[in-house]
Amino acid sequence: MNTETTQDTTEAKLPGERLREARERLGLTQQTIAERLCLKITTVRDIEDGTTPADLAPTFLRGYIRSYAKLVHLPEDNLLPIMDKQAVPKAISVSPMQSFSLKKSRKKRDGWLMIITWLVVLVVLGLTGAWWWQNHQAQQAEINSMVDHASSMQSQTEGQSVPLMDNSAPQETSTAGSAATPPSTPVDLSATIAATPSTPPSSTTASSAAPSSQSPSQANATQSQAAGNALLGAGAVAPAATVADSNPVSAAHALVMTFTADCWLEVTDVSGKKLFSGMQRNGSTLNLDGQSPYQLKIGAPAAVQIKFQGKPVDLSRFVRSSQVARLTLTAE
């Protein structure tokens, strides 16, 4: 009777308690057991306390207990069944099985995302096109208003009467005056001949060689004619010199425009005077000479080639943007 009670009490003890008692009977410490079994002292303590480490698999735990039992001379066949009875089964977490509907819903979500993306792209493209169309319409309206203004100004100019001057009477008076001037003004014949080297020497020699065959009135007429020719020669030389002097000034402000298509144009000089405002046809050339800097407005920059002071003017930036060209040309 006492033997059965002792066996039941022994079996009721946990494997860890039995291992601890056996270790104490042998006079061993936990550190000694850990060193002999090559375990951590915390693992030995958990085995004796009956605590299963969370990071330790049951298979390794059974192996550690078997080695511990052999070390303290306990039958391992009695410890392992007790451990299996008292072990608490772990709850196995089973992941829910994914159905095919999840993949289908993901595809559906991706489809909606693509639709929204394409809608955003289409809205951006539409806004860009609307912005470009508004700018194009504004430019066309501005060009049309400029053309209408130029046409109205041209019609007003054509409607005004321009008086015509009759230059025949002044020419006759001038001719008569020039003819009457030599007799009233004494002219030195020798000085006149010296001032006009273009007069042929033969005529002078012939006139001086035969003085006896001319009357005094004829001699006076000859002298008057020679003096008139000298004055006309001097008058012809003076304007030529004036034109030659004025050419550098004109070249410094010369503006030449050649048109390859119909184009509206407006040119204003530094004083605010409009040198030109209207349409120019294909193949025409416009030469302007005023006071720089010039203010230019060109409706179709691609249809005009500009030279200022003999140098071409670059209009490529206006041609690329298809805008009305507004630029200022300043003399160097």
Swiss-Prot record:
Residues 1-111 are cytoplasmic. The keyword Thylakoid does not apply. It is a single-pass type II membrane protein. The chain crosses the membrane at residues 112-132. Keywords: Cell inner membrane, Cell membrane, Cell shape, DNA-binding, Membrane, Signal-anchor, Transmembrane, Transmembrane helix. GO terms for molecular function: DNA binding. It is found in: Cell inner membrane. Residues 190-225 have a biased composition (Low complexity). Residues 19-71 form the HTH cro/C1-type domain. SMART domains: HTH_XRE (SM00530). Its main location: membrane. Residues 30-49 bind DNA. InterPro entries: Bact_Cytoskel_RodZ, Cro/C1-type_HTH, Lambda_DNA-bd_dom_sf, RodZ, RodZ-like_C. Residues 149-225 are annotated as: Disordered. The keyword Cell membrane applies. Residues 133-332 are periplasmic. One of its GO terms (cellular component) is plasma membrane. Belongs to the RodZ family. Cytoskeletal protein that is involved in cell-shape control through regulation of the length of the long axis. The helix-turn-helix (HTH) motif in the cytoplasmic domain of the N-terminus is involved in the formation of spirals to maintain the rigid rod shape. As this protein is anchored in the cytoplasmic membrane, the HTH motif may contribute to protein-protein interactions to form the RodZ helix, which is localized beneath the cytoplasmic membrane. The C-terminal domain may be critical for determination of the rod shape by probably interacting with enzymes required for synthesis of the peptidoglycan layer, including PBPs in the periplasm. This is Cytoskeleton protein RodZ. It comes from Pectobacterium atrosepticum (strain SCRI 1043 / ATCC BAA-672). The gene is rodZ.
